[in-house]
Amino acid sequence: MAALAGFAANSLLCRAALRPGEADAATFTTIRLATGAVTLWLLARGTRAPILGAGSWRGAVALFAYAAPFSFAYLRIGAGVGALLAFGAVQTTMIAWALRSGERPRPAEWAGLALALGGLVVLVSGGLSAPDPAGAALMLAAGTAWGVYSLIGRASVHPPLATTAANFARALLLSAALSAAAALWRPPHLTARGALLAAASGAIASGIGYSLWYAALRGLSATRAAVVQLSVPLFAAAGGVMLLGETITPRLVVAGVAIVGGVAVALASRRDRRPSNPRPAV
């Protein structure tokens, strides 16, 4: 549960820093990746996992393509809505890849996927309570990129901590370039509180949260590991209400039930066919 709370905390910390203007999105992303890289490097060193040669530029690009839109999206949408959008995009991406790879879903899986996609449509469809279109598009892009990153990571032969540490370090270079480019358009903005929130997102919610998740995976089947992640958007929505003063709209409730319920139906019908190494949620 601590690892899952860490994943939800990423949404809350990002929103808490960006909504009141404690940091600009590019700077927040760079600090998050930097502190995450350092934390993961220290954790990997502690396990003596070889970092040199681990990871890949493909993985780093996918990680950056998740982290940057994730931050910019939270300038426009709430924590609960963002987590639901990202979660739906991650699952849709991975299911689409499974179909492309020749996996034949069962009828219940098709029904669950249709229900989850219907929930996404409800969430982003027009109306006064619909999320900002640009913010929703950015978060869907972030979720898709995280799904791609997860698929890339499944093929890694290196220890997960070493792979993630190396990918964070490479993605940091891309984020630094983004920050430099953004500074040409608008001066960077960062308060002490914004820096603290970004560092907490990178070091604790991402670095320590991921390490706890990898440890938990040893005692979970692939299906159970996927099912327990269904609570992450709910944690984020609850945290947004209690800590950030966000409101829960009927649209969010209906969409949340449809998305989480749909994926639960799909996953409950699937039995583990081979060992796998799923990655953590947004």
Model-derived regions, located:
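Cytoplasmic-side transmembrane-helix entry/capping segments in multi-pass membrane proteins
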Residues: 1, 52-62, 103-116, 136, ...
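Hydrophobic/aromatic residues within transmembrane alpha-helices
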Residues: 17, 28, 32, 73, ...
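Specific transmembrane alpha-helical segments of multi-pass solute transporters/efflux pumps
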Residues: 6-9, 47-87, 95, 115-116, ...
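C-terminal-most transmembrane helix of multi-pass membrane proteins
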Residues: 33, 230-282
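Specific alpha-helical transmembrane segments that line the substrate/conduction pathway
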Residues: 27-38, 63-64, 71-104, 142, ...
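Glycine-/small-residue-enriched transmembrane alpha-helix faces in small-molecule transporters
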Residues: 1-30, 61, 65-69, 118, ...
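Hydrophobic alpha-helical transmembrane segments of multi-pass integral membrane proteins
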Residues: 26-42, 112-115, 134-141, 152-207, ...
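Hydrophobic transmembrane alpha-helices of multi-pass small-molecule transport proteins
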Residues: 40, 63, 105-125, 142, ...
